[in-house]
Swiss-Prot record:
It comes from Schizosaccharomyces japonicus (strain yFS275 / FY16936). GO terms for cellular component: cytosolic small ribosomal subunit. Required for the assembly and/or stability of the 40S ribosomal subunit. Required for the processing of the 20S rRNA-precursor to mature 18S rRNA in a late step of the maturation of 40S ribosomal subunits. This is Small ribosomal subunit protein uS2C. InterPro entries: Ribosomal_uS2, Ribosomal_uS2_C, Ribosomal_uS2_euk, Ribosomal_uS2_euk/arc, Ribosomal_uS2_flav_dom_sf.
Length: 289
């Protein structure tokens, strides 16, 4: 990848970053093309799919991170995602950078109607999809809030100030772009070094199907129940073996080894118990003296 003149060389993407963007299909656009997104398209495939220029994707990620880092209060940055694939990504981004997250349906009036309970006055908005988050972007334009958005080749760019060209329809591409953006913000703030790796895996930003999580929990519970049942059955079998007298001779010898008076008990069992009290003296005579 050729070095960019838009920012210092230290901010250039590494080979690993480019491989991650390609592996997550961030370069795969749609068949439709918005005229203002034409500058971000590298070429058009034979099947009509537009290929996004990954170099420009990285440049816009760095630009967006530098804009976010200039906001003094991280809570004044509002990240929005109406698309389910971006819910987990925006929540993780907010947790790591201190931003405010709106995951799910955007309530109309959040940025314009001060009477509503959820009224907010952010200084910057980051949207996952300009089409799905159109209401949030429209309200931001009313109150002059700058907007950063993840834009596909067919995304409308009305009221979008900074467009990050990427595939905003795949859960892997959405999660990876949010992860790269969070990492770059933390690096610019000094929380991370550029030479060290971030201990947060990119998988933490990926969408997970709730049904898949339930299936994993059910499988884990079933495995624990099976292990407990096996332990109970083994203990019951050992108890039955002891009750039936089927104890190994070596085990019995080891258990009874060193016991005192073992033979005396056997002799006392065969003797006459009535003769034991005959050897005692007359206690009444002793008391009379």
């Amino acid at each position: 990848m050729a070095e960019s003149v838009a920012h210092p060389s230290v901010l250039n993407a590494t080979e690993e970053d480019i491989k991650q963007l390609l592996a997550a299909s961030c370069h795969i656009g749609s068949k439709n093309l918005e005229i203002r997104m034409e500058n971000y398209v590298w070429k058009r495939r034979a099947d009509g799919v537009n290929i996004i220029n990954i170099g420009k994707t990285w440049e816009k990620i760095v630009l967006a991170a530098r804009i976010i880092a200039t906001v003094e209060n991280p809570a004044d940055v509002c990240v929005v995602s109406s698309r389910p694939y971006g819910h987990r990504a925006v929540l993780k981004f907010a947790a790591h950078t201190g931003a405010t997250a709106i995951a799910g349906r955007f309530t109309p009036g959040n940025f314009t109607n001060y009477i509503t309970r959820t009224f907010r006055e952010p200084r910057l908005i980051i949207a996952t999809d300009p089409r799905a988050d159109a209401q949030a972007i429209k309200e931001a334009s009313y109150v002059n809030i700058p907007v950063i958005a993840l834009c596909d080749t067919d995304s409308p760019l009305a009221h979008v100030d900074v467009a990050i060209p990427t595939n905003n329809k795949g859960y892997k591409s959405i999660g990876l772009v949010w992860w790269l953006l969070a990492r770059e913000v933390l690096r610019l703030r000094g929380a991370l070094t550029r030479t060290g790796a971030w201990d947060v895996m990119v998988d933490m930003y990926f969408y997970r199907d709730p049904e898949e999580i339930e299936r994993e929990e059910e499988a884990k519970a079933a495995a624990e129940a099976a292990a407990e049942a096996a332990t109970t059955a083994e203990a019951a079998a050992e108890f039955e073996a002891v009750a039936a007298g089927a104890v190994d001779a070596d085990v019995l010898a080891a258990a009874t080894a060193g016991q005192v008076g073992e033979g005396a008990w056997d002799e006392a069992a065969t003797g006459d118990w009535s003769t034991v009290g005959a050897s005692t003296s007359d206690w009444t005579a002793t008391a009379a003296q």
